[in-house]
């Protein structure tokens, strides 16, 4: 009932216009005033500037593929007072490799207000605060195609410090309890098994399978797990019911990637927070002061039969 109350005003607007053009509206999204809703009449995406992330992606009027922490709807946090990770859900950027910063993520990048500009062609330009901890800031340009469901993210990391920084752009997307996730199995790279298994993160019995050139991972209710992959095919996907979300990026041969060469990563979270993370990572770059690097990723949503795998 809450979702209908939130969206009733915008659904009427959709019926009054032709499909095939992207519009951007300011809405109240579960208590966050002034959220940005992009739609082309088929798909829609919502960016919440107060917490710096995409919080909704799906078909117009349909289910949200992204996981949201309903206990935190409408809430914000003060980065100066934040000592632990506040897990709002949705999609955001971190720097990688994680082993260089441990835990929690810098609240300047994860949970702080981001500046948003609507560009003339209905793209969103999103700018994070400066991360003093990492010496960087992120700038994202988010483009929804004029028709269909494809979203393109131009994710740029800028060195705002006075010395070299060496990082990868890491896009972390939390998916609402999918039935299964998958990525290509690739045995000709750095992982003879076809995937990389993170230390102390092996899947529960029966949760990981390999068939037809793919690695499939399901969520366990009691145990977290994480795998990575270095397939040059460069895609990763999740399916829930008859909805399939595929995320992709171009693999760059010969470049250094985090986590034993992983460009693709899947993390499964146990109950009570029922989500899986699909993660795309760019090459590790050494940036001089003022230099920047960009990593382009794409999302595509489609309807499939429950027996279809791709």
Predicted regions and their residues:
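A contiguous, surface-exposed recognition patch within enzymatic or periplasmic domains that forms
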Residues: 36, 43-45, 50-57, 64-66, ...
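Short, Gly/Pro- and small/polar-rich lid/capping loops
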Residues: 19-36
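Beta-strand elements of well-folded, non-transmembrane domains
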Residues: 130-132, 144-146, 157-161, 282-286, ...
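Short, hydrophobic/aromatic-enriched beta-strand segments in well-ordered soluble domains
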Residues: 42, 128, 291-303
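Bacterial N-terminal signal peptides
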Residues: 5-16
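Extended, loop-rich substrate-binding clefts of extracytoplasmic carbohydrate-active enzymes
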Residues: 23-25, 95-149, 166-167, 178-180, ...
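Hydrophobic core residues within well-ordered beta-strands of beta-rich domains
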Residues: 138, 151-153, 293
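Solvent-exposed N-terminal domain segments of exported/luminal and surface proteins
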Residues: 43-44, 49-106
